[in-house]
Amino acid sequence: MADKVLKEKRRLFVRSVAMGTINGLLDELLETRVLNQEEVEIVRGENATVMDKARALIDSVIRKGPQACQICINHICGDDPHLAGVLELSTGSQSGKCLTVQESQAVVPPFPAPQTVQDNPVKPASSEPRGSLKLCPPDIAQRLWKEKSAEIYPIMGKSIRTRLALIICNTEFENLPRRDGADVDIRDMKILLEDLGYSVDVRENLTASDMAIELKAFAARPEHKSSDSTFLVLMSHGIQAGICGKKYSEEVPDVLEVNTVFQILNTLNCPSLKDKPKVIIIQACRGEKQGVVWIKDSVGPSGNSSLLAAEDFEYDAIKKAHIEKDFIAFCSSTPDNVSWRHPLLGSLFIIKLIKILQEHAWSCGLEEIFRKVRFSFELADGRAQMPTAERVTLTRSFYLFPGH
């Protein structure tokens, strides 16, 4: 019986389900009259954390009986194959019912075969060939989840998630040299992020205040509620204080502080991205050889991390949220060193990052991918720079599962 299945999977459901799936389930259960409007509002409004909402939701459904539980299970199988895999649920190929793996003899894998990224091709701005994103085979995706499900950020099903990414690139400046090749960086990064399932917005040639406005608008997008992650790509000149706006000069301090970027996207200002990976890619020189420099995102390590009480981290007792968590910034070079950019081919860091993501995202977590990017720069070959991951607060491994 479906109610027995949900009772057995209750604890794992509470620990694994994402907010977007909870919202989808609530909408489905309201539409099918399993829950009424008051019950839905209680789940959403009277529970502070995602796990509290999940616990209230599944308990409400179980109390409604087997038919209500079956509707809930069917929705999970249809709209969140990742969660179905974690819970060992799958859709029966003959009956259309969603059964446990143990109950079904003929099942569809919880990770269906990925569609090629060329289903909706994006035409490059030039005739130059580009690489293609290697997709994650269903058996690899299932194995990774089976082995590491407790340590991996959950992904949401394609049919319900609304992933967003933002690229801000300053190419033209009033007082600084033009960043030739930046158009190639924009084109190729946009293609990559779209192939990974993100809807990408591009903003160009902004002042520091305009960049902050765009970031705040991006943080306020309602789509983040039903997303599982986000990417932010910043490409510009820089100085020690941060990222240069288009009007920067020694007399005009048109600078966006990197710390401001983190503040805009933190839990306090962007609660929709709470507990979800927020990846910040920054392409800029960090040394004086090119006349502009910017420093690392963090002035120094936090002095409070060792003072956090152990009970704050218990999965079923968390009532407070860390203001800054689940971030990673990947910078194009170490402090005091330049980042190289070809006027026709684009930035060396962006070129290598895209290539390695295309080749390894199907099997490697993001931090391992970033290590591979650093390794690709190990031999200087006359163009010395070393990309650096900073301000890392990821608590789990972030697998992109391209194609899923």
UniProtKB/Swiss-Prot annotation:
<dbReference type="InterPro" id="IPR033139">
    <property type="entry name" value="Caspase_cys_AS"/>
</dbReference>
<dbReference type="GO" id="GO:0072557">
    <property type="term" value="C:IPAF inflammasome complex"/>
</dbReference>
<dbReference type="InterPro" id="IPR029030">
    <property type="entry name" value="Caspase-like_dom_sf"/>
</dbReference>
<dbReference type="GO" id="GO:0016540">
    <property type="term" value="P:protein autoprocessing"/>
</dbReference>
<dbReference type="InterPro" id="IPR001315">
    <property type="entry name" value="CARD"/>
</dbReference>
<dbReference type="InterPro" id="IPR002398">
    <property type="entry name" value="Pept_C14"/>
</dbReference>
<dbReference type="GO" id="GO:0005886">
    <property type="term" value="C:plasma membrane"/>
</dbReference>
<dbReference type="GO" id="GO:0004197">
    <property type="term" value="F:cysteine-type endopeptidase activity"/>
</dbReference>
<keyword id="KW-0378">Hydrolase</keyword>
<keyword id="KW-0597">Phosphoprotein</keyword>
<feature type="region of interest" description="Disordered">
    <location>
        <begin position="111"/>
        <end position="132"/>
    </location>
</feature>
<dbReference type="GO" id="GO:0050727">
    <property type="term" value="P:regulation of inflammatory response"/>
</dbReference>
<keyword id="KW-1003">Cell membrane</keyword>
<feature type="active site">
    <location>
        <position position="285"/>
    </location>
</feature>
<keyword id="KW-0788">Thiol protease</keyword>
<comment type="subunit">
    <text>Heterotetramer that consists of two anti-parallel arranged heterodimers, each one formed by a 20 kDa (Caspase-1 subunit p20) and a 10 kDa (Caspase-1 subunit p10) subunit. May be a component of the inflammasome, a protein complex which also includes PYCARD, CARD8 and NLRP2 and whose function would be the activation of pro-inflammatory caspases. Component of the AIM2 PANoptosome complex, a multiprotein complex that drives inflammatory cell death (PANoptosis). Both the p10 and p20 subunits interact with MEFV. Interacts with CARD17P/INCA and CARD18.</text>
</comment>
<protein>
    <recommendedName>
        <fullName>Caspase-1</fullName>
        <ecNumber>3.4.22.36</ecNumber>
    </recommendedName>
</protein>
<dbReference type="GO" id="GO:0006915">
    <property type="term" value="P:apoptotic process"/>
</dbReference>
<dbReference type="Pfam" id="PF00656">
    <property type="entry name" value="Peptidase_C14"/>
</dbReference>
<keyword id="KW-0832">Ubl conjugation</keyword>
<dbReference type="InterPro" id="IPR015917">
    <property type="entry name" value="Pept_C14A"/>
</dbReference>
<dbReference type="GO" id="GO:0097169">
    <property type="term" value="C:AIM2 inflammasome complex"/>
</dbReference>
<keyword id="KW-0053">Apoptosis</keyword>
<dbReference type="GO" id="GO:0001819">
    <property type="term" value="P:positive regulation of cytokine production"/>
</dbReference>
<feature type="modified residue" description="Phosphoserine">
    <location>
        <position position="302"/>
    </location>
</feature>
<keyword id="KW-0963">Cytoplasm</keyword>
<dbReference type="InterPro" id="IPR001309">
    <property type="entry name" value="Pept_C14_p20"/>
</dbReference>
<feature type="domain" description="CARD">
    <location>
        <begin position="1"/>
        <end position="91"/>
    </location>
</feature>
<feature type="active site">
    <location>
        <position position="237"/>
    </location>
</feature>
<dbReference type="Pfam" id="PF00619">
    <property type="entry name" value="CARD"/>
</dbReference>
<dbReference type="InterPro" id="IPR011029">
    <property type="entry name" value="DEATH-like_dom_sf"/>
</dbReference>
<keyword id="KW-0645">Protease</keyword>
<dbReference type="GO" id="GO:0070269">
    <property type="term" value="P:pyroptotic inflammatory response"/>
</dbReference>
<dbReference type="GO" id="GO:0072559">
    <property type="term" value="C:NLRP3 inflammasome complex"/>
</dbReference>
<keyword id="KW-0472">Membrane</keyword>
<dbReference type="GO" id="GO:0072558">
    <property type="term" value="C:NLRP1 inflammasome complex"/>
</dbReference>
<feature type="propeptide">
    <location>
        <begin position="1"/>
        <end position="119"/>
    </location>
</feature>
<keyword id="KW-0865">Zymogen</keyword>
<comment type="similarity">
    <text>Belongs to the peptidase C14A family.</text>
</comment>
<dbReference type="InterPro" id="IPR016129">
    <property type="entry name" value="Caspase_his_AS"/>
</dbReference>
<dbReference type="GO" id="GO:0032731">
    <property type="term" value="P:positive regulation of interleukin-1 beta production"/>
</dbReference>
<dbReference type="InterPro" id="IPR002138">
    <property type="entry name" value="Pept_C14_p10"/>
</dbReference>
